[in-house]
Amino acid sequence: VNGMSRSMRAGAGLVGKAFAGKGGYEVRHPGAGEHVEAPLSKQVLVFAKGDKPFAIYPISSGKSSTPTVTGHFEFIRQEPGYNSHGMYYSFYFYGGYAVHGYESVPDYPASHGCLRTFIADQPEIYNRIFFGEDIFIW
């Protein structure tokens, strides 16, 4: 988020800024209480309470031929474990669109419309999301 690529390592200065709440991400919907944001231009999933982000994960959103829907949604359905499409611990927010783990999460839009996360991150993400929680995607 701080203009860094996924392969860069954060030095002490950047880590200190992040722990001081100055990590470089400005919450777009501070009046929404506890919620999730997905700014597709940054390819990240952000968990926030009011105007404070408390967790940020890298994602891969929908490619141009199968774009991710944008707008304001609520999480409506969950599916633990793997499904037949290789989606891991899915939490759906609109029809077949979900936040889910997947084996391939490049740093550019590559999915069929979902928000892909790393397999290792997804159980934590899945447990952070609650039914009816708002997600804002733009």
Go through the PLM ranges and name each one:
Residues 3-35, 66-73, 77-138:
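Exported/periplasmic cell-wall-interacting domains
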Residues 21-63:
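A structural motif detector for short, solvent-exposed N-terminal "entry" segments of globular domains
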Residues 2-3, 44:
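Cell-envelope/ECM-targeting effectors and their regulatory/trafficking segments
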